[in-house]
Swiss-Prot record:
Protein name: UPF0215 protein Ta0042
Source species, domain of life: Archaea
InterPro entries in UniProt: Endo_dU
Family: Belongs to the UPF0215 family.
Pfam families found in the cross-reference section: DUF99
Gene3D superfamilies to which the protein is assigned, alphabetical: archaeoglobus fulgidus dsm 4304 superfamily
Length: 205
């Protein structure tokens, strides 16, 4: 049992690491909540955040939206709300990237700790965290956003012959790879975020 007496040395000092996430049992009907945002224009104060609830095979069950502040810090709260609006049945949160509505940065570890649902943040190979950090330091001077970005440890995912990247919380890389692959019909990106992206583009018109 994790956290039990046997997990600690006799001296009483805790282990110098936290146990990593265990291999996940992935059932065919597992629900995924796909997250992406809407485009916004210069001068906009808000943007839409879209949540698409679907089964692993791509069957869509529900869509919801929530407002977030441009360059704000409320995206974690908005994702929690989308999780609640869709009935708390999602067993995976899958999002497109880590930054929404400009530099509204999702803290995926904090999100996982709040809702206890594994988080997969998928993005294109070659995305530069350092460029994002430089822009935040220049325009926003927000150390918390910088801290979140520096804490990320992206892993490489091979999907349909493509290489993409993912940041993970509460899930191991092998399970994330399987979920991404099984939720992809064609191309490099899974249906959950592909559809959330399409809906977001419509709402942003």
């Amino acid at each position: 049992m994790i956290g039990g007496r046997d997990d600690y040395p006799e001296s009483g000092f805790s282990l110098p690491f936290e146990p990593g996430p265990r291999r996940m049992q992935i059932k065919r009907g597992i629900r995924i909540l796909g997250i992406d945002d809407s485009p916004f224009s210069r001068g906009d104060r808000e943007s839409n955040l879209v949540g698409v609830l679907m089964r692993m095979d791509g069957y869509v069950e529900m869509m919801e939206k929530e407002k977030i502040q441009v360059d704000g810090d409320d995206v974690n709260r908005a994702i929690e709300n989308l999780f609640l609006y869709t009935g708390r049945v999602a067993r995976i949160i899958m999002m497109s990237g880590i930054s929404f509505a400009g530099f509204n940065i999702c803290d995926i570890d904090a999100l996982y700790q709040r809702i206890r649902v594994p988080v997969i943040s998928v993005f294109e190979q070659g995305g530069s965290v350092e460029r994002m950090i430089a822009a935040i330091e220049k325009h926003l001077d927000d150390p918390e956003k910088v801290r979140i970005l520096r804490s990320l440890k992206p892993v490489e995912i091979r999907n349909n012959g493509y290489i993409i990247m993912a940041n993970l919380s509460g899930i191991d890389a092998q399970s994330a790879q399987e979920i991404i692959t099984r939720n992809t019909i064609r191309g490099k990106f899974p249906e959950a975020i592909r559809l959330a992206d399409l809906v977001g583009k419509i709402l942003g018109r």
